[in-house]
Curated annotation (Swiss-Prot):
The chain crosses the membrane at residues 4-21. It is a single-pass type II membrane protein. GO terms for cellular component: cell division site; cell septum; plasma membrane. Residues 1-3 are cytoplasmic. This is Cell division protein FtsB. Belongs to the FtsB family. It comes from Buchnera aphidicola subsp. Acyrthosiphon pisum (strain APS). It is found in: Cell membrane. HAMAP family: FtsB.
Length: 71
């Protein structure tokens, strides 16, 4: 019975170590989650900038069309 307890405790510690520090463990998940959050914020900024550029292009095209109509 004592050997079984030692084996089960060893297994538990090994599984916990793998969960927290192993490949694709909790620490890797936290790192990736932070990167994704940063990239989402960056994408929001780029979307806003793209929308501003689209508005500038539309305004430019409207001014060109007005000038063509005047002539």
């Amino acid at each position: 019975m004592k050997i079984l307890k030692i084996f089960l405790l060893s297994l538990l510690f090994w599984l916990q170590y793998s969960l927290w520090f192993g490949k694709n463990g909790v620490l890797d998940f936290i790192k990736i989650y932070r990167r994704v959050t940063i990239e989402k914020k960056n994408n929001e900024y780029l979307d806003m900038r793209n929308n501003q550029i689209i508005l500038e292009i539309e305004n430019f095209n409207n001014h060109i069309n007005k000038d063509k109509k005047k002539t």
